[in-house]
Amino acid sequence: MMNRFRKWLYKPKRSDPQLLAQFYYADEELNQVAAELDSLDGRKDPQRCTLLVNQFRSCQDNVLNIINQIMEECIAHERANRDFCVKFPEEIRHDNLAGQLWFGAECLAAGSIIMNREIESMAMRPLAKDLTRSLEEVRNLIRDQALRDLNIYTEKMKESLRHFDVLFAEFELSYVSAMVPVKSPKEYYVQQEVIVLFCETVERALKLGYLTQDMIDDYEPALMFTIPRLAIVCGLVVYAEGPLNLERKPEDMSELFRPFHTLLRKIRDLLQTLTEDELHTLERNLCISQDVEFPANADPEVPSAISPVLVTALPTEEPPMAKAENTEVELACSMQYDEQELEQLNMMVHRVGDEMSSLLSPPSVYQSPAHRANTSNEASPCRRALDNLTDEEDRVFFMEDLDGSGEVLARSRPSETTISWVNNSCYNAKQPALYQDSVLQNGDLADVVSVKDGQRDISNNNNIDGSKMLAASASLQNSCSCLEAPESQLYLNGWDTNGEDAETAEIIAHRTGGMKISATVIFNPKSLTNSPETSPNLASNRIPSSSDPLTSNEEDESHKLSIAATNCLINSCVCCGSCEDTREDSLEGLRNVPSSGKVINASYSLIKSKELGHLDRSDCTVSAKELLKMDSPTVLLAEKETTRQEQPYPNSSKCLPLNSGSQVEMDSESDEPLTASRDQLRSESNRQETGNKERPSEEVEEPPSDRASADNITSSSSSQDGLRDSALSSISSSDYESVSVTTCSLSSIDSLSSCSSDDIDQEEIQLALQAAKIASRQKIRSRFHSSNDLIHRLFVCISGVADQLQTNYASDLRSILKTLFEVMATKQETDDKGKQKKANQGLRSAALEDCALCQETITSSELAAKARDGEFEDPPDWVPDEVCSLCTACKAPFTVIRRKHHCRSCGKIFCSRCSSHSAPLPRYGQMKPVRVCTHCYMFHVTPFYSDRAGM
């Protein structure tokens, strides 16, 4: 009864602007809607139910907004911390978020659960109950105070508001975190790095003329697309150590670019092959919002991205089919399937690792999907090139791991390319003998490096045609001429190249002081696998003969022994004859392998030429003759089997199964030093070589004297005792197939210091690596018809990634661009405040000189005082419609669509665009927002502008 009397006596007026009065009526409206909603059967009238629910939530928003204003007024300095709100996505940070939270809290308190969030719902239910209970208490206290005194906030009400504010902030964080992903501090730090990258990109674009400052100041809409595109290029090339550093783990990258990690790696590899002019052209094209048309039939010659310093060291590779007339091949890289290109790029996942770890790891034997085995028996390089281009048309383009990094993929080649050359086409008699007789038959070197059990045989030369076989025989007989048949195919780093590139390997080998095999491995780290046509021959060659007691169970051990023995031979050559002890230890370990038969690789002609070449070195203290003598029994037996099986070509080197009685017996127990002079060793080597060539095809056994001599020679101690513990001398039999020649070559650099005149400098090793890198880049560029084709591919891929950011990460991208514009927009000079004030006053007077309200001397504070006292002015007279045919502000003519609107503040006529604001006009008694023009809204309605301008 007392409450009714007080309500009747002290009930506030609806027009009262005080917060407690406004809350009273807002809460009354909420209670009415809630009561009607409770009494309504939603199944009978669903439309009415939906309407009431929306009205109920709107009333909740209104009540919470007024409570928030009351808290800002009475406990302004005691509010709960809400810094976590910056973590929320922009799309949920709106005015009615509080009402949604209240509605969610009531649902959870009533026992409901959030869909697919059962655990979070159970955890938040106690907090939701506390929040609804506290909110009900706050509402009762504020209603009671509104019926007592509208100007006083009691301590009890303040304490209740503090408790409610803390609970509401805690529930807001929990509820929003359960509904939407909230960034962690680490993710915010990464996003700040992305913002810095975008700012650096815009600053660079301004310097290079891609963008203008006016575009930034005017918030040009096209920049929403241009800036992310340019940022991808800068993040991959210019600022490679920034947030787009692909050497990081994907989980450490920004979530914007994390899904595109693989595609960005491919884009980076292509960007690194561009010249400065090409990069400039690409960035220019990326600044254009629409698609750019690239000429399809441009100059087929792709400009080289090689620095001028290395152009002479590595000649530019000419496209093998530059003059092809096949129009289908010309359209292989057609630009009509850009979307398909992007999808295929996303599917190409190839791991890319460290550069040196690739060079020091054994090559893989698996075929690359970019080089499938051809099924054609045609030996023409033109046909082979056409097939390769046809494959490229299917897969658009496939980027190899740049710099030889990552997982090294094996290559599958046709049978006609089973001979490859790595020697100089123009032999110079003054050059060391290292340059002689370096033929690699059937990928001799590469296949020795990595051989998988049961996948291929190293010694298959049955498919070599006559011209190639004659050339191979000439090479084995110390011929210095290169294979000039048109069917010959050269391999550099596993790719099709010309003879000049092979010459480069020789040059680098010569500069590095006898590391020709190492240089060759660097250029050719990928194994050459045989084509399907040669598989039957391989299978037949692997079957032991009737006189050979080898069984199928012993073939694995035989292959391991072959690999290890050949690696030891190559090791002795690469290390300039200073690793004899290492090779002795390796062969001693090989004797203990439990196998009744061995397979020894007969790459004797290659190793022999290398070792004889070392005899010409003036300062080497260790002769290579001992290496020849130690290896001679094995090699001679292998050559005997070679001459017996291939009568037409007696000089062909092969890797064949040996009889079980032919064991490798190397006795290294003697410690007598080597006393023979260099001339004697050279003459003995020549006799040994002559004897090998003239040996008949019948069974040959080693004389005891030769074996004794070999035992004495191999027992000599080397000055490099540290190499006894090298990788090749300590590996087990199960690890033989993973031994890498490159490991031996690089780990033996220290041993080369024994040759004082040919010390290998670190710069020359870097030169070899850089040359290999350049060859790799040239191979990537050779897959594109022209420079424009390459630029177009990059344009498509980069634009695709940047445009997907607009769709998948719109909120984050808007936040980044918003910060970007705030940072990069032109700042007003604040150094001279007097000049700025005068400029503002001049601008104000110039802008308002034709307005009657601007001529008044009364200030906004005086107008506010009059409004509080109830002294209202008469509204201005409206301009008649018939006397005005143009908008007062923009001078646009009025039409049926463009209607006339009067400003309630000045009475003039404007179009809808120039009078789109609403504001209360208390000086005229208008407490509700009414239509005003832009001029009045800026200069007369908004008090802070009027006061500041009048200072």
Swiss-Prot record:
Residue numbers binding Zn(2+) 2: C903, C906, C933, C936
Glycyl lysine isopeptide (Lys-Gly) (interchain with G-Cter in ubiquitin) crosslink location in chain: K87
Biased composition (Basic and acidic residues): 679-709
Predominant location: cytoplasm
Family the UniProt entry places it in: Belongs to the lst-2 family.
Stored PANTHER family: LATERAL SIGNALING TARGET PROTEIN 2 HOMOLOG
Domain notes: The FYVE-type zinc finger mediates the interaction with phosphatidylinositol 3-phosphate (PI3P) and localization to early endosome membranes when not monoubiquitinated at Lys-87.
Identification of the protein by name: Lateral signaling target protein 2 homolog
Organism lineage: Eukaryota, Metazoa, Chordata, Craniata, Vertebrata
Gene: zfyve28
